[in-house]
Amino acid sequence: MGWAVSLIATLGLAGLVVSTNDVLTRQQGDAFARKVVAVQDHANTGAVTQRATSFTQAETNSYLKFNAAELLPTGLTEPSLTMHGGNRVSGNAVIDLDVVRQKQSSGGWLDPTSYLTGKLPVTASGRVITGDGNGRIELERAEVSGVQIPKSFVNQLVNFFTRTADNPRGSTVDDVFELPANIRRIDVEPGRFTVHQ
């Protein structure tokens, strides 16, 4: 399941707003989880047949709300995504900037975390570009509490939230990343995304 949250986070980095039409339920979150298991099982069997699995926006956001809380990094809460199509994604999360500042702030006057404190809404939008088992993010816009922020600050947040035991240095928005579970590409359509293995 860990790669599923990473995949959602990747989509979310292109757009860190749930549509008002989405009704989120635990059942939809569970449906998302079952699909993740099926995608991983397909990868584990070493099957050579191609397979496409679609995840709806409601399933994705239900999973984030009901199933993924313990999988999210400390300091990141209430994530949600809107899938626009054309591989465009937007989304938001509440970020505890005090946690970010305590762990990685330089404390300098040019460090944005020196001025921003508390839990603030962060929004972003962009495109997810994938193919041949790799992906990258094309960031279009990001904001903290409605104020546009520079890409360097987005990179600082991404770097902080992507640090793991396997990736202790973290990542940036500009990094090319390998897609998990033998996924070759991801297509984002209005209200859903499809992974192709």
Summary of predicted features, one role per range:
Residues 2-6, 10-197:
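Extracellular/lumenal and peripheral-membrane lipid-interaction modules
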